[in-house]
Design a protein with these regions (language model features):
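Conserved active-site "lid/cap" helical segment
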Residues: 2-98
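Cofactor-binding loop segments of dinucleotide-utilizing enzymes, especially the Rossmann-like FAD-
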Residues: 11-13, 105, 164
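Generic, well-ordered alpha-helical segments
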Residues: 67-79, 106, 110, 136, ...
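Acyl-thioester C-C bond-transforming condensing/cleaving domain
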Residues: 2-3, 88-94, 108-173
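Short glycine-rich or small-residue beta-strand-to-loop segments that form or flank ligand, phosphate
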Residues: 98-105, 132
């Protein structure tokens, strides 16, 4: 749009069920982390982290890493719920969405990307443009907003952004 009147009209958030303080996570991981890694984690300033499954699901007492269960991480379910709530809060319908952009660190599967999964789970048209930006949610936000601004061509365009900052156990020692 030429008049630069592009803006964010609503925000909705939802957290996964399992919340852990950074200290709790360090305690659970015990001697699997070096002192330098522990110090780095504490200096990040993140007080709480949220997981889609209990932390114990990913870490056990042996040195064997526990993999995700066959149904994958239910991250797309959380994203679907928050996307639908956002539309409802704004008084929009699924037919109002002209594009979806999903940003995520972790996804249910390696492929397809989260936006493709959300099209199906939310019942959106499979013919609307949809994009994935993979990376840490904090670093993908600026790119997501830049892309979104460039996708809006007229006042009727409604781009749904879904940003997942869900932690999964894939990176735990």
């Amino acid at each position: 749009m030429s008049d630069n009147s592009v803006g964010i009209i609503g925000l909705t958030r939802q957290y996964p069920e399992f919340r852990y303080s950074t200290k709790e996570m360090i305690d659970v991981l015990g001697n699997k982390l070096t002192e330098k890694v522990k110090e780095n984690i504490l200096q990040l300033g993140v007080e709480n982290r949220y997981f889609v499954r209990p932390l114990e699901h990913y870490v056990n007492k042996s040195s064997k890493q526990i993999k995700s269960v066959p149904d994958g991480e239910p991250i797309s379910d959380l994203c679907k719920n928050v996307g639908e709530k956002c539309l409802s809060d704004l008084g929009l319908t699924k037919n109002d969405v002209t594009c979806i952009v999903a940003a995520f660190e972790d996804n249910d599967f390696l492929s397809p990307g989260l936006s493709s999964i959300l099209l199906t789970k939310m019942g959106l048209s499979k013919f609307i443009p949809h994009y994935n930006i993979q990376g840490m949610a904090c670093s993908t936000l600026p790119k997501l907003l830049e892309l979104g601004k460039n996708l809006i061509r007229n006042k009727n365009d409604k781009v749904l952004f879904v940003i997942s900052g869900c932690n999964s156990g894939w990176y735990l020692p």
